[in-house]
């Protein structure tokens, strides 16, 4: 079952601290202003807070340039990392699996049985045992993926819209901290050494680099990424229509292809990477809405929400991030004919 509280994050934690006499809290250090503000608020109370940056691919001192010299274009960053052969450090070994611990707040929390959350159509069916949360399930999923031939075909399948095998599906466990980017890389390296090293396996590393790059962009620019014009790399005006945003959010636009994506997101909390880009482009370019509203909606819906990846990807699409071409404007008809030529995805959700 899933235990949850509806409360301000810090207020909720402090209630637990007081009730159960907790004297220390351990957490991930995230370079985003809301998360940093939460740390500051917690440190102002009688509880020791220990925050660690451990979700990245590299340690801070491995990055081959000062933060203010971080390239504003991903390709320059990637080439610098690869030319200097910067490699992630090996993750700490997992000596023993952590057994599930019964929550100390069961008597006060609401419970949702997984059977009530069954989404058989989802590309990430959380009601299936192998898609459950937690370190053990995440690590088992990681092992299973790299014990298959899926890594060797990843680049060919990664843009598909349906099914559970077209992409790695690591993101929910990565976003929750159950597995780390360094663990993924360690499995990838072993796969390349013992099975096959090809363009597809490189592309898994390529996507890990994107994730790392967006984390560094957040560290470099801080709150600026949330501004209307983002990083200011485009002078395009930012408009907004509340009416159009509601149509998009509820999956009631003039495009059933877009509606299918928005319904999948709302019903399951998951969406393929390709579809995320398509619906984002549609909101910004066809419906003339503020990209930050779309980013906020994704934040409220995604089971794999990651502040850096989410907001940087939205800014990128809108032309207010790190895209040197000033954003991406997808031709929706072409996207549909390429990725859903027979209308199977559209029929599944609409």
What do these predicted ranges mean?
Residues 1-89, 94, 263-264, 309, ...:
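Trp/Phe/Arg-rich N-terminal binding region typifying the photolyase-homology
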Residues 4-7, 133-136, 252, 256:
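Conserved phosphate-coordination/catalytic loops
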Residues 16-21, 46-53, 96-110, 321-327:
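Short secondary-structure transition/capping segments
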Residues 70-228, 336-350:
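Glycine/tryptophan-enriched, flexible segments
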Residues 163-350:
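Active-site-proximal binding-pocket segments
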């Amino acid at each position: 079952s899933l235990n949850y509280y509806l409360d301000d994050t810090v207020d909720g934690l402090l209630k637990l601290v007081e009730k159960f006499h907790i004297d220390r809290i351990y957490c991930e250090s995230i370079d985003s202003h809301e998360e940093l503000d939460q740390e500051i608020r917690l440190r102002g109370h009688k509880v020791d807070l220990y925050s660690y940056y451990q979700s990245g691919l590299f340690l801070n001192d491995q990055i081959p340039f000062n933060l203010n010299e971080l390239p504003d274009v991903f390709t320059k960053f990637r080439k610098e990392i690869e030319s200097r052969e910067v490699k992630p450090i090996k993750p700490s070994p997992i000596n023993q699996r952590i057994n599930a611990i019964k929550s100390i707040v069961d008597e006060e929390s609401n419970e949702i049985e997984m059977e009530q959350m069954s989404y058989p159509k989802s590309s990430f069916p959380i009601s299936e045992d192998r898609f459950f949360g937690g370190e053990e399930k995440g690590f088992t999923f990681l092992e299973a993926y790299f014990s298959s031939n899926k890594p060797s075909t990843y680049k060919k399948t990664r843009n598909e819209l349906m099914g559970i095998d077209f992409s790695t599906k690591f993101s929910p466990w990565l976003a929750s901290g159950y597995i780390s980017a360094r663990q993924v890389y360690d499995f990838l390296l072993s796969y390349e050494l013992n099975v096959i090293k090809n363009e597809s396996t490189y592309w898994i590393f390529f996507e890990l680099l994107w994730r790392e790059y967006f984390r560094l962009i957040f560290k470099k620019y801080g709150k600026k990424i949330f501004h209307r014009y983002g990083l200011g790399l485009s002078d395009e005006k930012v408009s907004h229509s509340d009416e159009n945003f509601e149509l998009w959010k509820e999956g009631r636009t003039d495009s059933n292809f877009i509606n299918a994506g928005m319904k999948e997101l709302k019903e399951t909390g998951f969406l393929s990477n390709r579809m995320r880009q398509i619906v984002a482009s549609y909101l910004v370019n066809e419906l003339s809405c503020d990209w930050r509203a779309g980013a906020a909606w994704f934040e409220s819906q995604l089971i794999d929400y990651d502040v850096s990846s989410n907001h940087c990807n939205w800014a990128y699409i809108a032309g207010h991030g790190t895209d040197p071409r000033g954003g991406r404007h997808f031709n929706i008809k072409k996207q549909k004919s390429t990725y859903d030529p027979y209308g199977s995805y559209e029929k599944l959700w609409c």
